[in-house]
Amino acid sequence: MGIVMLIMAVTALNRLNLSIAGKTIEEEFGFDTIKMGHIFSSFLWGYALFQIPWGYICDRFGPLRTLTASILCFGFGAGMMGVAPRLAASAGLSVLLLFQIIRFFTGVGEAAVSPSCVRVIASWTNLKERGFASGLQSGGLGLGGTVTPIFIAWSTIHYGWRTSFYLCSALALLTVVIWRAYATDWPEEHKRVNAAELDQIHPGAHSGDDRRRRTAKAKSVPWLKMLTSASVWGLILAYGCQGYAFYVYYNWFYFYAVKVRGLHMMEAAAWTSAPFLAMAVLSPVGGWFSDRISRRSGRRQGRIYAVWLGMGVSAILLLAGSHLRITVIALPMIALAAGFNYFATSNFWASCIDLAPDFSASLSGLMNTVGNVGGAISSTATAYLAVHQGWSRALDVAALITVGSGLLFSFVNAGQTVEERPT
């Protein structure tokens, strides 16, 4: 799980870097808020459209090769951002257009990460620990987001925004080296995992024959059963709403701190770490809470209660924080709203494994596609609402959609796989 958290942290770094360096880019090239929203959306469309293909590839070929290709792709995209203005000038292209193309490509690369990490969790964790393990995965994203604002702001101030992207690219390459050195697709393939540990991970299911059986099954994803399942539709639509709210924090918190709350660059960067610190802490707590309830009342109740609690508290905090005038109270409340969003989010990923244990990467890809369509809509809609109706109204809409996420998740029955469902 340590390597999974590292990959998620580096993913956060390469996704969030534009949100911090974006203020400097905006000033250098004369972009307005709506144009920056288009650049943010470009990443998310690439990220959303390639979730399902990457999920299938991971189920078919395993996370080892899939994540290697993924990290190389988005690391290359980060490096290209630094040279984009020079390329645009020499080719006679619009810098805005080239930024959008590169961020789309970066999104394509990052699209494999979450489905592949879910596949790792499905292969490497015990049934009773899925919620907590999924929380650690999401917590890795939070840890990366905690460090990124200060790291990117510091490197941008001292060395320029281009250097910040080159550093992100270099860290991605280092992560590939670590991943290839230590990871395997299955616990059975790892030299340091013994028979007792295999029995603890998947009791009675660690033989080579069983591994080959599971690999063969993964080649035929039961899409019809998935797409006719009320649980799957509840899951993916709820995650679409979650994605809308999540990308308000992810893309716009720094801009909000600078433009609305009047903070300076480093001060805003420090505050921008707060939502991700809250995510890093509360995501594993949400997974642990869900696992604990699941052992007492069943997985359906465990996942639903955790999502209801997380999304409900998140909506209240976001709504209250957006209308408070006192910055030192408002920003922590909005940061905690992000944290409780992720208290719930770990249970979405765990539910992918609950519903489709042998096809978890494919279902995760489907879910994350819808989630990031919500995020892409959020990136543009939040900018539009902020410009035309004010930031309070933009955040009110995000709070309302957060409530919708919790309500839609009520249809998810994590106690029954899609293959067990009567036809």
What are these regions (language model features)?
Residues 3-31, 249-254:
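Extracytoplasmic
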Residues 18-20, 226-284, 344-345, 349, ...:
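Extracytoplasmic gate region of multi-pass secondary transporters
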Residues 41-56, 273-286:
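Central cavity-lining transmembrane alpha-helices of secondary-active solute carriers
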Residues 72-92, 312-325:
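C-terminal ends and interior cores of transmembrane alpha-helices
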Residues 102-142:
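Cytoplasmic helix-loop-helix junction between adjacent transmembrane helices
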Residues 141-190:
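Helix-loop-helix hairpin linking two adjacent transmembrane segments in secondary transporters
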Residues 300-347:
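C-terminal transmembrane helical hairpin of 12-TM major facilitator-type secondary transporters
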